[in-house]
């Protein structure tokens, strides 16, 4: 199978029981801020910040907001590579990884819709942590 060039191609070829939830998550994340774009990274939908930022080492993944891990058929795992820096009063973010990542696990479209506001707040709070070069 040919490697997908963009998220549309990736999702159109996706055979996952939670396709509807993936589409809902995509819309929620992209609608949260006009400076969020998407790409295929690590063979998954990935969302990153396109706005102004202070210079940084690309290996720090400071532009990467969230990667959608679709490797399990019974759930979707949102991986925030720098999630430890996010203020999350809702408690939606989980994990104590030494590399600073945090995750959110969804098992259904209904669960995604239930946490829509909290997820948008997590993404907004991530954007607030950005060191801007102004």
Predicted segment positions?
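Charge-dense, helix-prone N-terminal extensions
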Residues: 1-134
């Amino acid at each position: 199978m040919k490697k997908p060039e963009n998220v549309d191609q990736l999702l159109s070829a996706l055979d996952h029981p939670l396709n509807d939830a993936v589409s809902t998550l995509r819309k929620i994340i992209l609608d949260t801020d006009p400076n969020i774009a998407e790409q295929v990274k690590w063979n998954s939908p990935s969302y990153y910040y396109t706005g102004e930022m202070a210079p940084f080492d690309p290996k720090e993944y400071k532009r990467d907001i969230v990667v959608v891990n679709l490797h399990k058929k019974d759930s979707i795992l949102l991986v925030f590579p720098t999630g430890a820096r996010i203020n999350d009063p809702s408690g939606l973010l989980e994990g104590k990884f030494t590399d600073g990542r945090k995750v959110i696990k969804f098992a259904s479209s209904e669960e995604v819709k239930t946490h829509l506001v909290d997820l948008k707040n997590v993404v907004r709070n991530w954007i607030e942590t950005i060191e801007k070069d102004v």
